[in-house]
């Protein structure tokens, strides 16, 4: 899957991630987020969930990514305890100078589409810092709802919202 879009004079392209992208994905992860993962973690997720793992390119340079996983678990959306197949956005990041161009939205939409169409997931969820208003607003725009607060979720003690959306 691949598509290009332009906003504010910048054209970007969304495509499936490749193993050759992992070094740049790790660089983006380190620059953009306090939650960092080892090399093998990215490689394993890419190998296992390749169809829903996307990167964004500007002028041939990877500037953002979304790393998912697919799992079985209790629904975050249904009232009764129901076992469902769901997508989990493990990590999503865009380099600071490329934010507010729609790249995060495009990455999420591409991954969510693959979660549903390729992996037959019924819903998607993620964790987000309660202080990360831009991300929370983006997720709400895409249909996510705050399900619950995860107290002291992050290593620095900050709480997270668990947010979920139907696919």
Swiss-Prot record:
Binding, acetyl-CoA: 92-94, 100-105, 132, 139-141
EC number(s) on file: 2.3.1.255, 2.3.1.258
GO MF term (any one): protein-N-terminal amino-acid acetyltransferase activity
Site (described: Plays an important role in modulating multiple conformations of loop regions and contributes to protein thermostability): 75, 82
GO CC terms: NatA complex
A matching Pfam family: Acetyltransf_1
Binding site for Zn(2+): 88, 127
Residue sites binding substrate per the record: 37, 154
Domain N-acetyltransferase: 12-167
PROSITE patterns: GNAT
Record's keyword annotation contains Magnesium: no
InterPro entries: AcTrfase_RimI/Ard1, Acyl_CoA_acyltransferase, Ard1-like, GNAT_dom
Domain of life: Archaea
UniProt-annotated location(s): Cytoplasm
Reactions catalysed according to its record: N-terminal L-alanyl-[protein] + acetyl-CoA = N-terminal N(alpha)-acetyl-L-alanyl-[protein] + CoA + H(+); N-terminal L-seryl-[protein] + acetyl-CoA = N-terminal N(alpha)-acetyl-L-seryl-[protein] + CoA + H(+); N-terminal L-methionyl-L-leucyl-[protein] + acetyl-CoA = N-terminal N(alpha)-acetyl-L-methionyl-L-leucyl-[protein] + CoA + H(+); N-terminal L-methionyl-L-glutamyl-[protein] + acetyl-CoA = N-terminal N(alpha)-acetyl-L-methionyl-L-glutamyl-[protein] + CoA + H(+)
Annotated site residues (Plays an important role in substrate specificity) in this chain: 35
Keywords attached to this entry: Acyltransferase, Cytoplasm, Metal-binding, Transferase, Zinc
Extra remark: NAT does not require a binding partner for activity.
Subunit comment: Homodimer.
Functional note: Displays alpha (N-terminal) acetyltransferase activity. Catalyzes the covalent attachment of an acetyl moiety from acetyl-CoA to the free alpha-amino group at the N-terminus of a protein.
Family affiliation: Belongs to the acetyltransferase family. ARD1 subfamily.
Name of the protein described by the UniProt record: N-alpha-acetyltransferase
Taxonomy of the source species: Archaea, Thermoproteota, Thermoprotei, Sulfolobales, Sulfolobaceae
